């Protein structure tokens, strides 16, 4: 499995995976992802099996220690020099779940945050399923 950051070339695949993983009322739109990738594409962790995007995690960097609803909607709040790595969405296509891929992405994001000198990473989620630890 390859893990890499996002470019605008990944936009359609990212939006498609999000649409498959979240209900319409909760899923970020293609336009929101375009804005996110434009501001902080280096803070997307995309996992591929061959050429197929199977999972991803994204979030921006800020000096604010608490994740707020406003952060989901305003990619422009990203501050590359911020102390905290926010993590907004963790998506794995249904047929690839229960293989540890989400955990791999989280581990990579936390490791990258550590290497970049961040104070920590913040992930907030709504329980849709159960976490397997």
Located regions from the model:
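Glycine-rich phosphate/pyrophosphate-binding loop shared by adenosine-nucleotide-utilizing enzymes
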Residues: 1, 52-56, 85
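A short beta-loop-alpha structural element at the N-terminal edge
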Residues: 1-14
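Helix-loop element at the rim of GNAT/NAT acetyltransferase active sites that forms part
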Residues: 16-30, 36
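Conserved beta-hairpin
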Residues: 43-57
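Conserved acyl-donor/pantetheine-binding loop and adjacent beta-alpha core of acyl/acetyltransferases
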Residues: 57-90, 97
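Conserved acetyl-CoA-binding loop-helix of GNAT-fold acetyltransferases
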Residues: 92, 98-111
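Conserved GNAT acetyl-CoA-binding A-motif
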Residues: 106, 113-126
């Amino acid at each position: 499995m390859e893990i890499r950051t996002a470019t605008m070339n990944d936009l359609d695949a990212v939006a498609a995976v999000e649409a498959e993983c979240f209900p319409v009322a909760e899923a970020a739109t293609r336009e929101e992802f375009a804005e996110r990738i434009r501001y902080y594409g280096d803070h997307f962790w995309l996992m591929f099996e061959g050429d197929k995007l199977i999972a991803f995690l994204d979030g921006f960097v800020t000096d604010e220690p608490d994740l707020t609803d406003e952060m989901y909607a305003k990619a422009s709040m990203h501050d590359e020099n911020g102390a905290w790595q926010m993590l907004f969405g963790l998506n794995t296509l249904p047929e690839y779940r229960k293989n540890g891929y989400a955990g791999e992405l989280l581990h990579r994001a936390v490791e990258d945050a550590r290497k970049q000198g961040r104070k920590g990473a913040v992930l907030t989620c709504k329980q849709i399923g159960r976490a397997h630890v």
